[in-house]
C-alpha cells in the first residue's frame, strides 16, 4: 500500500524546513506542503468525496497546483489534470468521459471549467492563492494498492476524441524514482521548469522526481525565455527541464548574460520532441551544462529511454532504456530489429499505464498480454543500444514509394543559421501520393528565401527527401509544453500550392515507384 504523497511526508518528517516549492517570491517548505495538502484532502473528504472519485484539476504551474494535486492523492481520489486553455466543450468532454465528481480551477482562469461543470451538474471549486479551503481539517492519508489509478491524463487526440491514460500510484512513484536516478538528483538540487504541470513531462519527470529526492522545484506559471533566465539566476538552479523550443528561445535572449549567473547549472533535461543537434551544442556552449535528451510518452509516465548522465549525451539519440524498463524496436511481424534497422518502439516496465479509461479495445490494441506497450513511434538502435527516434508512424511521408522521415529533414533545416523553427509534413499529391512540405520560421531580420532553403536541403539530403513545398511563417503552432503541433497546421493551402522544384525521373535506374534524381544542371 502506498500514496503519491509518501515522498513529501518522508521529507517533511526528516527535513521539514527544506524548501520544496518556489513560485516567484513564494516559498513552501516540505512541512508546509505536507500540511496544506493533507488539509486539502480533509476538505475533499468533508465535501463527500470518496477514494476512487475523479477530480478535474485546471491550473497553471504554480505551487497551488502541487498542493491540490497531492491533496487529491492524499484523499485517495483520482486527479484529472487538464490544459488551462481548455474550452468549455473540451472541459465538458473530459468531465463527462472521466465521470468527475468535482472540478477545481485556478482563480485566474476563465469560466470555461465552471460552466462546463454546471452543464453536467458537477460541483466546482476555485483554487485560490495559498490553496486555502474552508472547513478544512487534517485527515489521514489514504493508502492504495500501487496498481490503482491515481491520475488520468488525456492524450492530445490527434485522431478521434482524446483518450484518458490511467497512471497508477506505482507508475507515478516509479517515475519519480527513475527521474531522480537519471539526473543523479539529490536534496541539494534546485530544479526549475517552465513546463506545464498538467502535462506528463512536468508532472512525472520534474515534479515527482524532485519531490522524490527532497529537492526544490522552481515554477513558471507560463514559459517566457527571459523569465526562465531570470529564474535560473535568482534561484541558482542546478537542473532545468524543458523542450527544444524552450532551449532555442533561451539562447536568443541570453545575449551577453554573465556565465557566472548560471555557474551552478549542471544538467538540462530535454524531452517532448527531438532535440536538434545544433540547438544542443549551442545551449551547452552558452550555458556550460550538459543537455540530456530522453524519450517517453503519456502512456509510459514520461519515461522510456534517457542519455546516461555519466557518459554524456549522444547527439541525435535519446539514450538507452532507463532503470527497470525494457525497450525494444520491432518489425511489422513483432520480431526485434537488429541495430540500425527502423521499426516500432515497444516499452515494458513499471511506468507503463494501466490502460485507457473505459476503452478496453483501445487498451488491448497497444498493450500486449505480457505488458509490452506499442508506442506508435518509429526508431532504431545503434550497436551501443542507444535509441534514435525517427518519427511517429503516422507522420511518415511516403513519396513515390520511398519513406521520408520528417525528423531527418527537420534536423537538416535546423542546421541552417537563419532557421529557428521548422516542421516537415506530407501533403497529398496526385503523382507521388504524398509530397514533402516544409514550414519554416526564420530569424528576425533574415532575408532567407525558398530558393536558399531548397539549395540547403538538396546539398544534404537524397533528392526524394527534399521539400518541394516551402512556406515561411512567423511562428509554428505549439502545445502547452512548447512542442510543435503538426496537427494544427492547415494542409489545405499547402495541398494546392505549386511545387517549388521538379525533378526528372532517373531513367532505367529508378524502381517502379519512381526514385528521384538530383536536379539536372
Which residue ranges define each predicted feature?
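Conserved ATP/PPi-binding loop(s) of AMP-dependent carboxylate-activating enzymes
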Residues: 320-324, 335-366, 404
Amino acid at each position: 500500500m502506498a500514496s503519491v504523497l509518501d515522498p513529501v511526508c518522508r521529507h517533511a518528517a526528516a527535513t521539514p524546513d527544506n524548501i520544496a516549492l518556489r513560485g516567484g517570491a513564494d516559498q513552501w517548505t516540505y512541512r508546509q506542503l505536507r500540511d496544506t495538502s493533507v488539509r486539502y484532502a480533509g476538505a475533499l473528504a468533508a465535501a463527500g468525496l470518496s477514494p476512487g472519485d475523479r477530480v478535474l484539476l485546471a491550473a497553471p504551474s504554480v505551487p497551488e497546483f502541487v498542493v491540490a494535486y497531492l491533496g487529491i492523492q492524499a484523499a485517495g481520489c483520482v486527479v484529472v489534470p487538464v490544459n488551462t486553455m481548455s474550452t468549455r466543450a473540451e472541459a465538458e468532454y473530459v468531465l463527462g468521459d472521466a465521470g468527475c465528481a468535482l472540478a477545481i480551477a485556478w482563480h485566474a482562469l476563465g469560466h470555461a471549467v465552471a460552466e462546463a461543470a454546471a452543464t453536467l451538474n458537477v460541483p466546482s471549486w476555485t483554487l485560490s492563492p495559498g490553496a486555502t479551503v474552508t472547513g478544512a481539517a487534517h485527515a489521514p492519508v489514504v493508502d492504495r494498492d500501487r496498481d490503482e489509478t491515481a491520475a488520468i491524463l488525456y492524450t492530445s487526440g490527434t485522431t478521434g476524441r482524446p483518450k484518458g491514460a490511467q497512471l497508477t500510484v506505482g507508475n507515478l512513484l516509479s517515475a519519480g524514482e527513475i527521474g531522480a536516478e537519471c539526473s543523479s538528483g539529490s536534496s541539494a538540487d534546485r530544479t526549475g521548469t517552465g513546463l506545464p504541470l498538467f502535462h506528463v513531462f512536468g508532472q512525472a519527470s520534474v515534479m515527482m522526481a524532485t519531490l522524490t529526492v527532497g529537492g526544490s522545484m522552481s515554477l513558471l506559471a507560463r514559459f517566457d525565455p527571459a523569465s526562465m533566465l531570470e529564474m535560473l539566476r535568482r534561484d541558482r538552479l542546478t537542473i532545468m527541464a524543458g523542450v527544444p523550443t524552450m532551449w532555442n528561445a533561451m539562447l536568443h535572449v541570453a545575449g551577453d548574460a554573465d556565465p557566472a549567473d548560471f555557474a551552478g547549472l549542471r544538467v538540462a533535461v530535454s524531452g517532448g520532441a527531438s532535440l536538434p543537434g545544433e540547438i544542443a551544442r549551442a545551449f551547452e556552449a552558452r550555458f556550460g551544462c550538459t543537455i540530456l535528451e530522453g524519450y517517453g510518452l503519456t502512456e509510459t509516465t514520461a519515461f522510456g529511454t534517457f542519455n546516461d548522465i555519466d557518459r554524456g549525451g549522444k547527439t541525435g539519440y535519446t539514450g538507452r532504456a532507463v532503470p527497470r524498463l525494457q525497450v525494444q524496436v520491432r518489425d511489422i511481424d513483432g520480431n526485434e530489429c537488429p541495430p540500425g534497422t527502423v521499426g516500432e518502439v515497444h516499452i515494458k516496465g513499471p511506468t507503463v499505464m494501466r490502460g485507457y479509461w473505459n476503452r478496453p479495445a483501445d487498451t488491448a490494441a497497444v498493450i500486449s498480454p505480457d505488458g509490452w506497450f506499442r508506442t506508435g513511434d518509429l526508431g532504431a538502435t545503434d550497436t551501443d543500444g542507444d535509441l534514435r527516434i525517427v518519427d511517429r508512424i503516422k507522420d511518415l511521408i511516403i513519396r513515390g514509394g520511398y519513406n521520408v522521415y520528417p525528423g531527418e529533414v527537420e534536423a537538416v533545416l535546423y542546421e541552417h543559421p537563419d532557421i529557428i523553427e521548422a516542421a516537415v509534413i506530407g501533403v497529398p499529391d496526385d503523382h507521388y501520393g504524398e509530397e514533402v512540405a516544409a514550414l519554416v520560421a526564420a530569424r528576425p531580420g533574415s532575408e532567407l528565401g525558398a530558393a536558399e532553403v531548397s539549395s540547403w536541403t538538396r546539398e544534404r539530403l537524397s533528392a526524394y527527401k527534399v521539400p518541394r513545398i516551402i512556406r515561411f511563417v512567423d511562428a509554428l503552432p505549439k502545445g502547452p509544453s512548447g512542442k510543435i503541433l503538426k496537427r494544427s497546421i492547415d494542409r489545405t493551402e499547402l495541398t494546392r500550392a505549386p511545387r517549388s522544384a521538379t525533378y526528372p525521373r532517373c531513367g532505367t535506374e529508378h524502381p517502379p515507384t519512381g526514385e528521384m534524381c538530383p536536379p539536372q544542371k
